[in-house]
């Protein structure tokens, strides 16, 4: 994020795109050559074969009959929808008075992702001490609190809100995706792929809607909409039961 902003200021959008592409290629090569071999891997028939299709369809039916998985997939949808919406449009708020940040300063907002990395690592601790459902509820409440703080015209309070929001999103995502794997024993890969499809669909669906809200009503309406979305996620957790 930071390098692309720096490249855009010096070489334009083409330079920024080239920078991102090169870093992506380097990361792919590192992943290919540094990843250790899979452990406890068991090959299965591809869905293209008759046996594979039957196995895939049977697994899918089993997963779709679990209401808790539907809840977790929906929470993933709502979580990333909120997250992408905030980071898509917070820059427009910060470039306006009373903040009037430069492009380089706006790029530095993504340093707050550091809190997300710490939160993801702490999600296991949260699950052990509070249970996955309670921890997920706490993270959704923290996400809402962070959103409300971004309404402030104080840069310190706004950044605190962004930090809390980011922490809560990454921890919530880690908790929800982990719960999907625990629920879908024997079919974790398929359940996780559905979760990810729902997760990214949330970004695709909510991002443009929030953009229209920003264009018409500005930041307070954006926050109101996203607090409602997070509140829906919080209500859905009640269907998960204690865990």
Identify the meaning behind each predicted range:
Residues 8, 118-132, 214-215:
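Helix-to-loop junctions at the C-terminal end of transmembrane segments
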Residues 15-33, 221-238:
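Symmetry-related core transmembrane helices of the 12-TM Major Facilitator Superfamily/SLC fold
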Residues 35-75:
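Juxtamembrane intracellular "pre-TM" segments in multi-pass secondary transporters
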Residues 65-85, 163-167:
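Pair of pore-lining "gating" transmembrane helices in MFS-fold secondary transporters
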Residues 84-97:
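Helix-loop boundary and gating motifs at the non-cytosolic
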Residues 95-115, 190-194:
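Loop-to-transmembrane helix entry
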Residues 133-176:
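C-terminal transmembrane helical hairpin of 12-TM major facilitator-type secondary transporters
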Residues 182-219, 225-226:
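A late C-terminal transmembrane helix in Major Facilitator Superfamily
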């Amino acid at each position: 994020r930071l390098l692309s902003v720096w490249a855009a200021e010096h070489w334009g959008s083409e330079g920024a795109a080239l920078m991102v592409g090169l870093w992506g290629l380097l990361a792919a090569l590192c992943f290919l050559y540094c990843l250790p071999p899979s452990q406890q891997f068991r090959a299965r028939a591809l869905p293209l074969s008759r046996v594979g299709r039957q196995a895939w369809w049977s697994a899918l039916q089993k997963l779709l009959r679990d209401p808790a998985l539907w809840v977790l997939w929906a929470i993933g949808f709502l979580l990333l929808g909120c997250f992408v919406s905030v980071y898509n449009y917070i820059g427009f708020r910060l470039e306006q008075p009373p903040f009037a940040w430069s492009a380089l300063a706006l790029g530095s907002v993504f340093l707050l992702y550091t809190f997300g990395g710490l939160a993801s690592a702490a999600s296991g601790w949260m699950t052990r001490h509070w249970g996955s459902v309670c921890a997920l509820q706490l993270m959704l409440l923290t996400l809402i609190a962070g959103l409300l703080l971004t309404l402030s015209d104080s840069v310190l309070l706004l950044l605190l809100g962004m930090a809390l929001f980011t922490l809560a999103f990454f921890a919530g995502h880690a908790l929800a995706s982990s719960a999907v794997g625990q629920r879908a024993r024997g079919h974790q890969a398929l359940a996780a792929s559905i979760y990810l499809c729902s997760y990214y669909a949330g970004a695709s669906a909510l991002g443009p809607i929030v953009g229209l809200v920003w264009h018409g009503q500005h930041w307070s309406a954006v926050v109101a909409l996203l607090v409602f979305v997070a509140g829906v996620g919080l209500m859905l957790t009640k269907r998960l039961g204690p865990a």
